[in-house]
């Protein structure tokens, strides 16, 4: 089997206030690297990775296309455009910064206003290795998830790698389960999922005219995003 083959292509967005570590989270997940000499994302950044979920004959290969949105207020209107057609979102706050946690409701409102109603959202508390600087408890995060109907909460460390894989796997596993239950239709590309070359491909329904690439002007833009030198923020 071609190592680049996959069953599904899934669009995920990273969202949250500036400086919470979204880009470092992406760098750790995609490249398994840590770099503390990084800068804030300007506008939008992009990366991809293929992962496997499930066991045995039920195992699926999923290609994640992950969009890292800028947290600065001046780029927020740009970030909102990329929530359209997202199958999943990782909402990031900094466990050492209470203000970043208190801003989450606003970011979540943006996601749910712009993304499909089927979007799966998980909460990621970054910088969990800085326990002596903690300002947000795990109980507060769990309560927020319960109140806002977020599927799960994860405390992550891009520095150590702790829980980074688990965070993204949680999003993907939930999405795949919902596909198998018939709650999400991969033929409807507006939901942020497409069949890959390992899946049984059925004709796309004529009514599925929406496309989750609508936030990109054309394929040249996508190639440019993939080739550009990426800047990451911790």
UniProtKB/Swiss-Prot annotation:
GO aspect biological process, one term: exocytosis
Q: From the record, which residues define motif Effector region?
A: 39-47
InterPro entries from the UniProt entry = P-loop_NTPase, Rab_GTPases_membrane_traffic, Small_GTP-bd, Small_GTPase
Keywords per UniProt: Cell membrane, GTP-binding, Lipoprotein, Membrane, Nucleotide-binding, Prenylation, Protein transport, Transport
Q: Does the keyword Signal apply?
A: no
Q: Name one GO molecular function term.
A: GTPase activity
Q: Which residues bind GTP?
A: 16-23, 68-72
Fetch the Gene3D superfamilies from UniProt.
P-loop containing nucleotide triphosphate hydrolases
Where is this gene product found? Cell membrane
- Lipid-bearing positions (S-geranylgeranyl cysteine): 233-234
Membrane topology qualifier? Lipid-anchor
An annotated GO cellular component: nucleus
Looking up PANTHER family in the UniProt record yields:
DRAB11-RELATED
Q: Which family does it belong to?
A: Belongs to the small GTPase superfamily. Rab family.
Q: Can you name this protein?
A: GTP-binding protein ypt4
């Amino acid at each position: 089997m071609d190592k680049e083959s996959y069953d599904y292509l899934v669009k995920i967005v990273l969202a949250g206030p500036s400086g919470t570590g979204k880009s470092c989270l992406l760098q750790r997940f995609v490249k398994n690297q840590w770099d503390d000499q990084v800068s804030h994302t300007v506008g939008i950044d992009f990366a991809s990775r293929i992962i496997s979920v499930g066991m045995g004959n039920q195992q699926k290969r999923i290609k994640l296309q992950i969009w890292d949105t800028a947290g600065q207020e001046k780029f927020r209107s740009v970030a909102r455009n990329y929530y359209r057609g997202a199958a999943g979102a990782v909402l990031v706050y900094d466990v050492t910064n209470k203000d970043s946690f208190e801003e989450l409701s606003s970011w979540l409102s943006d996601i749910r206003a712009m993304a499909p109603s089927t979007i799966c959202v998980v909460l990621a508390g970054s910088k969990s290795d800085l326990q002596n600087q903690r300002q947000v408890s795990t109980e507060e995060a769990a309560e927020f998830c319960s109140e806002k109907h977020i599927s799960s909460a994860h405390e992550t460390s891009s520095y150590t790698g702790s829980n980074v894989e688990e965070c993204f796997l949680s999003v993907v596993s939930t999405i795949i389960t919902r596909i198998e239950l018939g709650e999400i239709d991969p033929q409807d590309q507006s939901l942020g999922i497409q069949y890959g070359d390992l899946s049984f491909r059925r004709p796309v329904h004529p009514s599925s005219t929406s496309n989750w690439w609508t936030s990109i002007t054309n394929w040249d833009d996508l190639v440019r995003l993939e080739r550009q030198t990426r800047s990451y923020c911790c």
